[in-house]
Design a protein with these regions (language model features):
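Alpha/beta catalytic cores of group-transfer enzymes, especially the acyltransferase/condensing modules
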Residues: 121-171, 264, 270
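ATP-binding N-lobe of GHMP and related small-molecule kinases
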Residues: 1-95, 113-120, 297-316
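DPxDG-like acidic metal-binding loop motif
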Residues: 32, 97-120, 144-149
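Short beta-strand-to-turn element immediately C-terminal to the catalytic PLP-Schiff-base lysine
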Residues: 39, 143-155, 215, 274-278, ...
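Solvent-exposed alpha-helices and their adjacent loops that cap or buttress functional pockets
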Residues: 2-4, 18, 27-30, 77-78, ...
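Contiguous, small/hydrophobic- and glycine-enriched helical/loop subdomains that border
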Residues: 80-84, 104, 110-140
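Glycine-rich, charge-dense phosphate/pyrophosphate-binding loop(s)
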Residues: 213-316
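Active-site rim beta-loop-alpha module in soluble metabolic enzymes
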Residues: 175-245
Length: 316
């Protein structure tokens, strides 16, 4: 198999995982995009990064996008080449907005674009390779498919699956991004090895409710409106409170926003906080005064896109 294109580019959205009860399974694509371009060369690999992570991420073969690109080329049976890569990063790193999943999805999709064959490295394959590298599909799936996703991995076969939901127009995500980082490994280390059966049951019910709400087809008994359903559906007992010591400001912000009537959750492993509903100017002002960067994002209806190359106009 040969490479048909020598200059390609992709864009990939930020994502928020968990969304409260959907630990390691639910995710949402956000309208904030990284863009990556690649020239195939015969020389050594080089990486230029602008924006988020500039000066901190690897700029050679150890770069996460490059590693994903290499793995995908191998999986497809395509030749390896040197690359000149340019990354325009808008997704903050180590903030719970899926920057690593987006980098991996970008790399695998760049391999698809370089190969230039519409039948090679489709979205399901991108999901599988990305989930293998990331370890779980909750951020990878929305980066691949857009919208809201519910994903799973078969522990025996390592097969990965995902279903996509189209959230109702009332879902208007707003991110509250702090000026401090939290590594995913540190956030996971704060979790207990087991949880009470009652807490697991609580989250199963809220996760199912959230799936119904995000599908846009929820009809509640008792006349509950979408806002009331969303407030209940974003409750969690499995991971957020357990991580309070690792990100006290984030959980305090979640408490404050929910007390003010907004369906707020920790985004992924944190420390970003996500409201699934738009917030008023007074909330934005007070949060900004407390040091939070407030970014209305919207839902990205599409996942990763090839923006340059022979496959740029091919739906996949």
């Amino acid at each position: 198999m040969r490479l048909r294109d020598d200059f390609v580019a992709v864009k990939v959205p930020a994502t928020s995982a968990n969304l409260g009860p959907g630990f390691d399974s639910m995710g949402l694509a956000l309208d904030l995009w990284d863009e990556v371009s690649v020239h195939a060369t015969t020389g050594a690999t080089s990486v230029v990064v602008e924006g988020e992570g500039a000066g901190n991420v690897e700029q050679g073969e150890d770069n996460l996008v490059v590693r994903a690109l290499r793995l995908a080329l191998d999986r497809a049976g395509a030749p390896q080449v040197g690359v000149r890569m340019h990354c325009t990063n808008r997704i903050p790193h180590s903030r719970g907005l899926g920057s690593s999943a987006s980098a991996i999805v970008a790399g695998v999709t760049l391999a698809r674009a370089l190969i230039g064959d519409a039948d090679v490295l489709g979205r399901q394959e991108i999901l599988e390779i990305g989930s293998q590298m990331e370890g779980h599909p909750d951020n990878v799936a929305p980066a691949v498919f857009g919208g809201a996703t519910i994903s799973w991995m078969n522990e025996e076969t390592s097969e990965v699956g995902s279903v996509r939901l189209t959230p109702p127009e009332a879902i208007h995500p707003v991110a509250f991004i702090p000026d401090f980082e939290l590594r995913t490994a540190a956030a996971r280390a704060a979790l207990p090895a087991t949880v009470p059966h009652g807490d697991a049951s609580f989250n199963v019910a809220r996760g199912a409710l959230l799936a119904a709400v995000l599908s846009g087809n929820a009809q509640a008994s008792g006349g509950a409106d979408l806002h009331a359903l969303l407030m209940e559906a974003t409750c969690d007992r499995l991971h957020q409170e357990q991580r309070r010591a690792a990100m006290e400001p984030s959980l305090a912000l979640v408490d404050w926003l929910r007390g003010a009537g907004f369906a707020a959750v920790v985004s992924g492993a944190g420390p970003t906080v996500l409201s699934l509903e738009s917030v008023g100017a007074d909330i934005r002002r007070d949060a900004a005064a407390a040091g939070w960067r407030v970014v209305p994002m919207g839902v990205a209806p599409q996942g990763v896109q090839i923006t340059r190359g022979s496959l740029s106009k091919v739906e996949f």
